[in-house]
Structure formats: C-alpha cells, structure tokens
Amino acid sequence: IDLVGKPQCFNCMYGFDFENNYLLFKSSNDSYHSKNITPNSLIAGTILPNKLMPFQNIGIQFNGITLSTDQNLKERINTNYYIKNPLSIAIPGKIWLIQLNKIKMTGKLKGFGQKITWERSTN
C-alpha cells in the first residue's frame, strides 16, 4: 500500500532464510516501493517458477509483514541472499525481510493438482 492508500506491486529477485523462515528481497533505497515499505508493513505477493509452461499453474501466494534487521541478523541474511543472487552484490540497496504469515501453493499440471496451505501459528 503506498502513501495514499493504493496497492503497489513490484517484481524482485528473492532469497530465503531457512533458519527463521524469512523471505528476503533487495530493493534500491530510492525506488517507489522501498519508500512505501516500513518495518511491520503488511505485504503480499506471488512467486512463480522461472519457466512458465502452458497449461501449468504452479506457484505460491503469500502474505506477511516486513521486519527490520538487527546487526547480528544482517550478516546471515546478506549471505543467504547473495548466495542465491550473486550478481546483485554490485547493485546498491537494502535487503528486506518478510515474516511469512500465510502461504498457499498451487501445483496444477494440465488441470490436475493440489493446493497446499500453511498459516503461522497465533500462539
């Protein structure tokens, strides 16, 4: 949601922190969407495979909140992100964390498949 209450979509490369189950993405500090993202912002998105094939509906939908990184976490997060996206080291920007709260995975091949959902425990 931007500063005037309108939805804002953007494409990005991502990584994952398996230890904490955080989704990671990097964005330039002066991009429109970075200016609208603050810690504890609600966020939603989709992740699709690199190759889209006709008659296949495969991917995930997620929602969560953005988190700030403390210095101890920052080094590990940067390492995880740059292992998956090594060329992005040369691009200035900030790596953001998303605490995933809900995921729905769709795996349909030629019309047949399943949907799997996961939701963070509220305890």
Question: How would you label these PLM feature ranges?
Answer:
Residues 1-29, 37, 43-48:
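Short beta-strand segments
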Residues 7-9, 37-38, 56-58, 110:
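Short glycine/proline-enriched turns and hinge-like loops at secondary-structure junctions
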Residues 54-123:
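Charged, gly/pro-rich active-site loop segments
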Residues 3, 50-52, 86:
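Short beta-turn/strand-loop junction motif enriched in small, turn-promoting residues
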Residues 25-26, 35-37, 87, 108:
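Short histidine-centered beta-strand/loop micro-motifs
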Residues 19-21, 53-56:
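Short, solvent-exposed loop/turn segments that connect beta-strands within catalytic domains
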Residues 27-31, 41-49, 75-85:
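Short acidic (Asp/Glu) patches
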